[in-house]
Amino acid sequence: MALPYLEAVLCFMILMYIFETYLDIRQHRALKLPTLPKPLVGVISGEKFERSRAYSLDKSKFHFIHEAVTILMDTTILYYRVLPWVWKKSGELATNAGLNAENEILHTLAFLAGVMIWSQITDLPFSLYSTFVIEAKHGFNKQTIWLFIRDMIKGILLSILLGPPIVAAIIIIVQNGGPYLAIYLWGFMFALSLVMMTIYPIVIAPLFNKFTPLPEGVLREKIEKLAASLSFPLKKLFVVDGSTRSSHSNAYMYGFFKNKRIVLYDTLIQQCSSEDEIVSVIAHELGHWKLNHTVYSFVAVQLLMFLQFGGYTLVRNSKDLFESFGFEDQPVIIGLIIFQHTIIPVQHLLSFCLNLVSRAFEFQADAFAKNLGYAPQLRAALVKLQEENLSAMNTDPWYSAYHYSHPPLVERLSALEDADSKKEN
């Protein structure tokens, strides 16, 4: 007797929706609290708190609607076997276009084109509302509708350019991988990730934002001095025009081996009240590098990817699995999609565990910056960024533990103060 794979997947999807909605309700209640957490009283202004509260509540209400629509569409698509219908119709369209639908690569590309069109249509209303209603209402959106459309078109063109060769390579590997399929798939994805990590900041990111060298001055001198003191191989220091799209701020680093680069959002420079606050944020980021957090995270992702491909090889020829989802044939891309659905429970658990590790890394990077003497500046910068980004001040502990990759502000400030107290004692 065939196992009810589809029914099990649908059941877990609904259970996870109920569980995550419960967490969302807890968070919504926390956001409605009319007072600041005690540690933030006197630190965050009342005006910023009210603005943050209003922004967070608007996003929370929007999230409830988006998630409800998403689970309704996803369960409908699976229950009514929409994917097998799309697969069949995409083959017919490919044939009508003069293509050979017997060629799995061509058939798959036609199928994915249909999926992409559907995804764009269903995501567009939510994206427009989020950007031009919620973000605009609270003073964050800086995009015009034409810039929004231009970015969307660029994203679609990149998918059309990069997607087909990647999909074709995966299909060929699966068809010819034999007993070492998991190794070949992982090797390909490992190489692809290295290539994308290399070309994204150099080729792709500049298509959407303008990167300019940080001008000579006190800030540049302090960052270069900090990098040199840590033997960080800083080659280039950029400012990105994030303000053309949003008032949100950030900073990050990238690059391999001796070719490291640091990128500052222009909004970060505008929002921090001193160069030392900005440098403290960079000290935190360099802490991730010095403590090998980036390497550990990359290795963990690669290991999980290899295990995932190993699991896929065990079920890719399961006729019962494909039939449960309504497929008579066993196309490679469909097998991967079905497998992703069957391991949803494991993915949720792993996501939770990775968030735990990520939060631990954030505490360690904060402590690293503090040990360099930037504790006061980092506290001030964290508070400033929390205020300017209107991030949630009150958070439910269950919600933050499950969803947050970064600790809430209260916990980060408390950890920095505890570190100071231990040092004084």
UniProtKB/Swiss-Prot annotation:
GO molecular function annotations of the record: metal ion binding; metalloendopeptidase activity
Cofactor stoichiometry and binding remark: Binds 1 zinc ion per subunit.
Transmembrane parts of this sequence: 3-23, 62-80, 109-129, 155-175, 188-208, 295-315, 332-352
EC code(s) of this entry: 3.4.24.84
Localisation: Endoplasmic reticulum membrane
Enzyme class: hydrolase
UniProt-annotated catalytic positions: E285, D366
Example GO BP: CAAX-box protein processing
Alphabetical keyword list: Endoplasmic reticulum, Hydrolase, Membrane, Metal-binding, Metalloprotease, Protease, Transmembrane, Transmembrane helix, Zinc
Pfam families in alphabetical order: Peptidase_M48 (PF01435), Peptidase_M48_N (PF16491)
Gene Ontology cellular component annotations, sorted alphabetically: endoplasmic reticulum membrane
InterPro entries (UniProt xref): CAXX_Prtase_1, Peptidase_M48, Peptidase_M48_N
Protein topology in the membrane: Multi-pass membrane protein
Annotated positions binding Zn(2+): H284, H288, E362
Taxonomic superkingdom: Eukaryota
Main location group: endoplasmic reticulum
Catalysed transformations (reactions): Hydrolyzes the peptide bond -P2-(S-farnesyl or geranylgeranyl)C-P1'-P2'-P3'-COOH where P1' and P2' are amino acids with aliphatic side chains and P3' is any C-terminal residue
Gene3D superfamilies: Metalloproteases ('zincins'), catalytic domain
Entry cofactors: Zn(2+)
Keyword Protease among UniProt keywords: yes
Family classification: Belongs to the peptidase M48A family.
Function: Proteolytically removes the C-terminal three residues of farnesylated proteins.
Entry protein name: CAAX prenyl protease 1 homolog
Species in which this protein is naturally found: Oryza sativa subsp. japonica (Rice)
Originating gene: FACE1
